[in-house]
């Protein structure tokens, strides 16, 4: 098939494209390189600063449109898949629908439906916005209020979301929680794909013996700490290391270049990732592919959803239980003899559920099913 990815996030589409090319498909990625990550793309669409940057970006989009025709599958990164206002994005969406056989959506980040479900606090038991009926620290911030008012929950975004969801041929969710929200909106044209990890390029550094000290690792994204719950993970790790200084240590890095980040991560035993996720995300999965043990989201309903009953190596932490992070980190220190087994199981888990070839095949099967129903019935 001839496949076009429009937009990227955390190298998701580029990794998926690499796997699909290996299967034999012709794949093009057009994106801004996930902004600061500067990921690989075939066609660059990056928006510069100021009015001149905006004008140039619109011109680049218009100039690129003829190259975005004639594909069997167009896969969008988000309902807002370009750095444009919804009205202009809608025009490009209509163009893509008219000049290609199908248009799909990656459910892999915030959009109107997901943020609405989080903010209402009824569908999901917790999120970055709510802990049951209680607003999170981020939810109470000025940033979140501005986001709800002028961004994801605006009337303009609601209308745009409805238009896109009605117009796409299907959507593929990368996380359990995105699937859980979207199956109530588009149940008949939704699939689960997972996050693709290029395990072939990641050399495992297994924990072969019980370490004298457990080396915890946490990466801080400036400006995203409260949103991801990294602030709470960091505080708990510091308390545990202070309590067990002879048996544990903590390395904290902030805004490192990606390659240096991976290098420092590989020298650790346990990575602390996200607090408000039901599903291990890209950072945790890459660490697990290296043989690290991840402290992250991995709720029982996620494991049940993917049909995994035996290999459950992720240390799940709950934001709903007071002291849960401290307790789980203390458990790791007190049971560090289990780290070699968890290390091997972590890599095994990623190979089984998130290897980029596995995720690519899930996408391929779903696309073919939808195309067959659309054109052969």
Region spans (language model):
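A charged, aromatic-enriched C-terminal amphipathic alpha-helix characteristic of glycosyltransferases
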Residues: 336-368
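Conserved donor-binding/catalytic core segment of Leloir-type glycosyltransferases
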Residues: 189-228, 234
């Amino acid at each position: 098939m001839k496949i076009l990815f429009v937009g990227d996030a955390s190298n998701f589409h580029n990794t998926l494209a690499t796997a699909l090319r290996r299967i034999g498909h012709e794949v093009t990625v057009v994106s801004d390189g996930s902004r600061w990550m500067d990921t690989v793309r075939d066609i660059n669409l990056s928006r510069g600063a100021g009015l001149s940057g905006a004008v140039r970006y619109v011109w680049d989009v218009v100039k690129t449109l003829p190259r975005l025709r004639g594909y069997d599958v167009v896969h969008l990164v988000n309902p807002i898949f370009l750095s444009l206002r919804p009205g202009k994005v809608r025009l490009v969406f209509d163009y893509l629908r008219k000049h290609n056989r199908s248009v799909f959506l990656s459910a892999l980040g915030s959009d109107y439906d997901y943020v609405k479900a989080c903010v209402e606090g009824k569908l999901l038991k917790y999120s970055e916005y709510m802990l049951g009926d209680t607003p999170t620290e981020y939810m109470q911030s000025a940033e979140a209020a501005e986001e709800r008012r002028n961004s994801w929950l605006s009337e303009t975004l609601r209308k745009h979301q409805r238009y896109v969801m009605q117009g796409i041929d299907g959507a593929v969710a990368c996380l359990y929680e995105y699937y859980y929200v979207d199956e109530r909106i588009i149940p008949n044209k939704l699939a689960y794909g997972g996050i693709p990890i290029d395990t072939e390029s990641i050399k495992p550094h297994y924990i072969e013996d019980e370490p004298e000290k457990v080396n915890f690792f946490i990466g801080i994204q400036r400006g995203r700490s409260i949103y991801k719950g990294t602030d709470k993970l960091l505080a708990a790790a510091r308390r545990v290391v202070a309590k067990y200084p002879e048996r544990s240590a903590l390395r904290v890095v902030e805004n490192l270049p990606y390659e240096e980040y991976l290098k420092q991560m590989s020298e650790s035993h346990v990575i602390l990732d996200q607090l408000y996720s039901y599903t291990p995300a890209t950072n945790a999965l890459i660490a697990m592919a290296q043989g690290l043990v991840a402290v992250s989201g991995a709720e029982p309903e996620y494991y049940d959803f993917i049909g995994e009953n035996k290999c459950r190596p992720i240390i799940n932490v709950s934001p709903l239980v007071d002291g849960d992070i401290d307790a789980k980190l203390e458990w790791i220190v007190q049971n560090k003899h289990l780290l070699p087994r968890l290390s091997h199981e972590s890599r095994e888990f990623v190979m089984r559920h998130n290897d980029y070839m596995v995720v690519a095949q899930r996408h391929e099967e779903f696309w073919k099913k939808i195309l067959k129903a659309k054109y052969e019935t």
